[in-house]
Amino acid sequence: MKKEIIKWSKDFETGIKAFDDEHKILVKTLNDIYNLLNEGKRDEAKELLKRRVVNYAAKHFKHEEEVMEKYGYPDLERHRKTHEIFVKTVIEKLLPKIEEGSENDFRSALSFLVGWLTMHIAKPDKKYGEWFKEKGIVIEDEAVKID
């Protein structure tokens, strides 16, 4: 039986469909990784984390930042910085821990990712959603596709 380490909630919705769809992909990916770990498929979980969390998140961040820049979102630089710190943390700290560490290290890294994503969507991402809504800006973009 599949379990969820993170459950999508309406509370995560930014009001920008493309970004919400991308966030749902990231949430599903974290749940898929969690289930692979529970099934003893650590190598598959590692590959999924690298392919989807690292690569897809980078595409998602770029998409968000491009839209923010296009419309003059005033908190773009701070938002961009949170993305940069996240990527640096994942590459420099979490990936080595996942590659070389124990299953508990992997689960700890996964917990960090869940916590970060939850907080990031619920606060800074919701903030830009509110800003776009206040300005009456409707984003018609499509969600970034999964590789």
Curated annotation (Swiss-Prot):
InterPro entries given in the database record: Bacteriohemerythrin-like, Haemerythrin_Fe_BS, Hemerythrin, Hemerythrin-like, Hemerythrin-like_sf, Hemerythrin_metal-bd
Record-listed Fe cation 2 binding positions: E64, H79, H83, H120, D125
CDD domains, A to Z: Hemerythrin
GO MF: iron ion binding; oxygen carrier activity
Binding, Fe cation 1: H23, H60, E64, D125
Signal sequence, renumbered to the chain: none
Pfam families: Hemerythrin
UniProt cross-references to NCBIfam families, sorted A to Z: bact_hemeryth, hemeryth_dom
Similarity remark: Belongs to the hemerythrin family.
HAMAP family in alphabetical order: Hemerythrin
PANTHER family the record matches: BACTERIOHEMERYTHRIN
UniProt subunit comment: Monomer.
This protein's name: Bacteriohemerythrin
Taxonomic lineage from the root: Archaea, Methanobacteriati, Methanobacteriota, Methanomada group, Methanococci
